[in-house]
């Protein structure tokens, strides 16, 4: 989990709009963010394996 202070800091409006960055909506992680799903790769993997994301399946061949 990300530090609460950093999550709150990211939510505040920035002085310059280019400073704004995305964070995972579940854990608050700023890196490896997947814009289409709004979460980081770790949370995406956990949710996909549990079947919580519609249309996403684990590939096998």
Swiss-Prot record:
Cofactor binding summary note: Binds 1 zinc ion per subunit.
SUPFAM superfamilies tied to this protein: Glucocorticoid receptor-like (DNA-binding domain) (SSF57716)
Ranges in coiled-coil conformation: none
GO terms, biological process: translation
InterPro entries: Ribosomal_uS14, Ribosomal_uS14_bact, Ribosomal_uS14_CS, Ribosomal_uS14_sf
Cofactor: Zn(2+)
UniProt KW keywords: Metal-binding, Ribonucleoprotein, Ribosomal protein, RNA-binding, rRNA-binding, Zinc
GO cellular component: cytoplasm; small ribosomal subunit
Residues binding Zn(2+): 24, 27, 40, 43
GO MF annotation: an example: zinc ion binding
General function of this protein: Binds 16S rRNA, required for the assembly of 30S particles and may also be responsible for determining the conformation of the 16S rRNA at the A site.
Family: Belongs to the universal ribosomal protein uS14 family. Zinc-binding uS14 subfamily.
Subunit details: Part of the 30S ribosomal subunit. Contacts proteins S3 and S10.
Alphabetized NCBIfam families for the sequence: PRK08061.1
Name of the protein in question: Small ribosomal subunit protein uS14
Native organism: Roseiflexus sp. (strain RS-1)
């Amino acid at each position: 989990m990300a530090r609460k202070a950093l999550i709150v800091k990211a939510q505040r409006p920035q002085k310059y709009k280019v400073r704004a960055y995305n964070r995972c909506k579940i854990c608050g992680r700023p890196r490896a963010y997947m814009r289409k799903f709004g979460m980081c790769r770790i949370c995406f993997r956990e949710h996909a394996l549990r079947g919580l994301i519609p249309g996403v399946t684990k590939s096998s061949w």
